[in-house]
């Protein structure tokens, strides 16, 4: 009588056999159809190795189970997505920081003079941070497209149009809240020494310092937007705006001069918005001005020390540029000394 224990190859399984005889996880992988492995064996009479496919008791070659094939494809897709997002974050940083660094050389020649080694260090730390930012972003980008994990939507009519700008404000406020409190935590002595000192090693910071973080600090910054997109609906275009604004503000807050008009940092509006004039004072005094976009938490918690100015740094840059024979040499030195005395 023919044996009834032999099953057909995996490619010929019926849907019931794929699910398992018992219809549950325990019966999902039949024991006589193990994962196909290729084991090296010596070819008779030659001593050379050849590959031998594992077969079941009936001589049928064994194929990978559907679970293994799906898991392999999933891991490959997630890895590629994470690598792609790392590349995007890194290139975005290089383009934006590079553009503002070039603008600095035109607007304030000599401001970054003597900081070449520091800027190389800032770029190295920032590119390492780009990988840390890219991994969770890549995983969620894959999960959004493949499984709808996030609350990101691409149909602008899926929600009322007024919700689009509202979601931007909500995201910015929550991001600012997260940044303020994690930033204050970073200034606790032990944490500062272990991690945040990397960022404050830039004295003064340059346009390249926006993402110059220790990995511990980079992780605290990398998780906030992924957490928000899991919880709060946002249109893909609005999310792009938030990410773009985050990058621009991170760079301009560190580049050593004020790019925004005075009403944004010196008038009533400036009492609530953070630009380079506000954040520069944090890098000078450390124990104040912790916010990212808004001065709300600094003012509420008594850590707001107002805005600073760049007169002394700009005067020093003007003297350095004049001494190097730059185009401002014909009077830049005297102007620089006057500005320095005024500061």
Locations of regions flagged by a protein language model:
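Juxtamembrane helix-loop-helix connectors linking adjacent transmembrane helices
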Residues: 135-174
